[in-house]
């Protein structure tokens, strides 16, 4: 089992380094419309990472000092990813659309968050689910950025994404190490696997319109190279205890509705806390 040096990570954590980025060169290179649409989706999600912490912060996850330290750095870094993507879009002459963070949570969502908190505190190993969920989403995000850089063919964007990806890989390493460590108990692994099988959907799919999620999946993960990226996620997660044979990203893409929106069902919160989301587009 690999180790993760949380102290080294905390010491290195900082806002995304954008020194040397040639912002003046951004408009000199063509940026495909598909890349603009994808960037807006990603920028919105990165900028609202703080929202995803609401439920998580009420669980046992933050009782672990390593997890608490990581999350403080994680949300700071992710927020700066969103700012960097917004700055790039503006430099390219494109607007970003602000989605204000809600100060008041709807009653139904608040009740679901409370239920999650109660369940998580009653079952100490629930943190394993959070960590597994985070590993899946961070690796998917990393590979999504890699695909976007390849497809967009914009040299300045490629440099910005490369810097973001270094952060995302560190995030993935932490989540994966923690999941691997916590899933060694067969009962924990079995329950975590059942929850992932039943509820997983990519980050943002509960917040973004279905057509945007569908577009993102098609643009980034179709074709031989896209499918290979999707398989990399599944193959890595299958190495976790209890997750042999799990079908995640490819199964999600194959099961996504092409024409009509999916009915509103139970989904899983992007950070790993169970919640009723707007639409379950997985399967």
Give the positions of each predicted feature.
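Non-heme di-metal
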Residues: 1-283
């Amino acid at each position: 089992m690999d180790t993760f040096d949380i102290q080294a990570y905390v010491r290195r954590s900082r806002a995304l380094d954008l020194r040397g980025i040639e912002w003046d060169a951004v408009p000199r290179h063509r940026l495909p419309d598909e890349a603009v649409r994808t960037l807006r989706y990603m920028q919105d999600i990165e900028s609202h990472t703080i929202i995803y912490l609401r439920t998580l912060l009420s669980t046992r996850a933050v009782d672990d000092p390593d997890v608490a330290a990581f999350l403080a750095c994680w949300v700071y870094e992710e927020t700066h990813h969103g700012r960097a993507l917004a700055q790039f879009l503006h430099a390219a002459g494109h607007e970003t659309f602000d989605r204000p963070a809600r100060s008041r949570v709807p009653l139904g969502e608040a009740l679901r968050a409370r239920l999650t908190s109660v369940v998580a505190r009653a079952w100490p190993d629930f943190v394993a689910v959070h960590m597994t969920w985070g590993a899946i989403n961070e690796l998917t995000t990393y590979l999504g950025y890699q695909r976007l850089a390849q497809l967009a063919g914009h040299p300045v964007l490629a440099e910005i994404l490369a810097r973001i990806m270094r952060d995302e890989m560190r995030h993935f390493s932490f989540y994966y190490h923690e999941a691997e460590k916590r899933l060694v108990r067969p009962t924990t692994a079995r329950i975590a696997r059942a929850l992932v099988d039943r509820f997983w959907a990519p980050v943002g799919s509960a917040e973004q319109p279905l057509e945007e999620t569908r577009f993102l999946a098609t643009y980034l993960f179709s074709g031989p190279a896209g499918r290979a990226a999707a398989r990399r996620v599944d193959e890595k997660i299958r190495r976790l205890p209890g997750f042999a044979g799990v079908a995640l990203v490819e199964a999600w893409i194959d099961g996504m509705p092409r024409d009509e929106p999916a009915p509103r069902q139970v989904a899983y919160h992007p950070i790993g806390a169970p919640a009723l989301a707007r639409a379950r587009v997985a399967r």
